[in-house]
Amino acid sequence: MMKRLLAAGSICVFLFLGVIGCGGESMAGYQKIPAAEAKNMMDKGGVTVVDVRREEEYKTGHISEAVLLTNETIGNKPPALLPDKNAVILVYCRSGVRSRQASEKLIKLGYKKVFDMGGIKDWPYDVVT
C-alpha cells in the first residue's frame, strides 16, 4: 500500500512539474534573430520593421519600409505606430543595444511577437535613404 501511494505521489509531482515547465515556455518574450532570418521573414511579408535609432541615423540609411520609432519615445503607452499587439515586429538599431532595450519595452507593453534583429551595421542587405 505504501509503495502505491509513493508511486502515485511521484507521478503527480512529475506531471505537475511537467505542466509548470511547459507553461514557462509560453511566457511572452522577444526573440533575437540573425539578419538572414529577418530578411526571410520580410520577404514573406506580414511584418512591421521598426528602426529605433534617432532620426538623424535613420536618414543616413535604413531598411526599406522600416518605420522610425526611436527607442527614447517608447514609454508607458503602446506607440500609435504599432496598433496591433499581435503583429510580427522586427526591431533594429545601429549595434543591437537599443534594439534589445526597445524589444524589452514592447514586450512589457503587451506585444506578443517581437523579434530583435540587432544592428544595421551587421545588415548585409540593401538599405535606402
Each predicted region: which residue ranges?
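Rhodanese-like catalytic fold shared by cysteine-dependent sulfurtransferases
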Residues: 3-10, 14-47, 56-88, 94-129
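Structural scaffold elements adjacent to functional motifs in cytosolic proteins
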Residues: 49-51
